[in-house]
């Protein structure tokens, strides 16, 4: 006697998982939307400043509905602060990736100075946003705890590099990390933020590759000559 196999219900099929379940896909879409919004916000705020930037233009650049801007970031001010944090975060992450602790102190410092110059050269939006924020007395960055927290690891890395250099007899002992970094950043920042006026005043095209290379060498040599115990010994 044959045993009958129970018939399967007509129309039922075994569910095959798709590339991503709806909740996962939604999370990915939300992350992509937020990233597009931040990129558009950085571009708009860098171009027009906080006061001149328009939320509807940011939405247009991001390719989304204007209401989604408020859904994800609440207000123009919140979006601006997020954009400001994002440009700082990118810089700090790239600085940490330099792995200065793996290099000899002088070599590490040369690498950091060169990186700082190159970063400003290729990120004019960073310069524009910082200039605008300082024009507004730093009102959006003051008290921003995430920004303070992200700076601490970099300062500690710079302090460790200085201490190693002092211990090796390479660096002067009267430099502190924060003042040194302000000098490194300030020398390059002034050059790029005032490049057009400096070019006009001195009658030189300071934005050419040759001019940038010459300035980069000068910034490194100028800083290292003040930091080294024996400037003749670069590494």
Residue ranges of model-derived segments:
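Short, basic, alpha-helical segments at the C-terminal edge of helix-turn-helix-like DNA-binding modules
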Residues: 85-90
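C-terminal peripheral helix-coil segments that are non-catalytic and often amphipathic
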Residues: 1-21, 115-118, 122, 152-168, ...
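Helix-turn-helix
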Residues: 2, 36, 40, 44-78, ...
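Hydrophobic alpha-helical connector segments
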Residues: 96-128, 148-151, 155, 177-181, ...
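Amphipathic alpha-helical segments used for helix-helix packing
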Residues: 108, 121-145, 195-202
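Short coil/turn segments at alpha/beta junctions that flank glycine-rich nucleotide-binding fingerprints
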Residues: 47-51, 102, 123, 168
């Amino acid at each position: 006697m044959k045993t009958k196999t129970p018939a399967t219900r007509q129309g039922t099929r075994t569910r095959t998982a798709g590339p991503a379940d709806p909740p996962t896909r939604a999370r990915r879409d939300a992350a992509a939307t937020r990233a597009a919004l931040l990129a558009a916000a950085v571009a708009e705020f860098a171009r027009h400043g906080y006061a001149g930037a328009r939320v509807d233009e940011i939405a247009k650049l991001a390719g989304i509905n204007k209401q989604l801007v408020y859904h994800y970031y609440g207000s123009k001010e919140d979006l601006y602060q997020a954009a400001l944090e994002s440009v700082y975060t990118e810089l700090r992450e790239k600085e940490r990736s330099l792995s200065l602790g793996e290099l000899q102190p002088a070599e590490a410092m040369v690498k950091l100075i060169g990186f700082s110059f190159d970063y400003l050269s290729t990120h004019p939006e960073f310069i524009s946003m910082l200039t605008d924020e300082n024009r507004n007395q730093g009102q959006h960055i003051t008290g921003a705890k995430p920004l303070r927290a992200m700076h601490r690891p970099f300062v500690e890395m710079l302090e460790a590099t200085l201490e190693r250099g002092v211990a090796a007899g390479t660096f002067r002992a009267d430099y502190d990390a924060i003042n040194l970094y302000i000098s490194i950043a300030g020398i390059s920042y002034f050059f790029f933020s005032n490049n057009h006026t400096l070019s006009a005043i001195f009658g030189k095209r300071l934005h050419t590759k040759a001019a940038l290379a010459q300035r980069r060498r000068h910034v490194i040599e100028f800083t290292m000559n003040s930091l080294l115990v024996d400037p003749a010994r670069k590494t």
